[in-house]
Amino acid sequence: MTTIRGDDLSNQITQISGSSSKKEEEKKKQQMLTGVLGLQPTMANHPVLGVFLPKYAKQNGGNVDKTAFRLDLIRMLALHRLNTKTGSD
């Protein structure tokens, strides 16, 4: 029988809980993307969504104003587009 030191055991617990929390975070992001924002999962690769989706998912407390999130996303997409157009001129 192998003895597991306390440090090893706590590292194993951290790895297990870390992977489950990552799965929960991904699930929240997908739910926010499709349920609240009404977007296709393929849009998750957009640079603006890559930045704001984790923030949106953390703010999502269940009872949210979908319109407010959508308007904020449209504003961010417009700013991104404006910055990329002026940067290339």
Swiss-Prot record:
TM region(s), chain numbering: none
Residues making up the signal peptide according to the UniProt record: none
Organism: Human herpesvirus 6B (strain Z29)
Main function: Participates in the assembly of the infectious particles by decorating the outer surface of the capsid shell and thus forming a layer between the capsid and the tegument. Complexes composed of the major capsid protein and small capsomere-interacting protein/SCP assemble together in the host cytoplasm and are translocated to the nucleus, where they accumulate and participate in capsid assembly.
Disordered: region residues: 1-31
SS bond list: none
Record's protein name: Small capsomere-interacting protein
Keywords annotated in UniProt: Capsid protein, Host nucleus, Virion
Coiled-coil annotated spans: none
Assembly behavior: Interacts with the major capsid protein/MCP.
Subcellular locations according to the entry: Virion; Host nucleus
GO CC annotation terms, alphabetical: host cell nucleus; viral capsid
Ranges of Polar residues composition bias in the record: 9-18
GO BP, sorted A to Z: viral process
Family: Belongs to the herpesviridae small capsomere-interacting protein family.
Pfam families documented for this protein: HV_small_capsid (PF17086)
Chief localization: virion
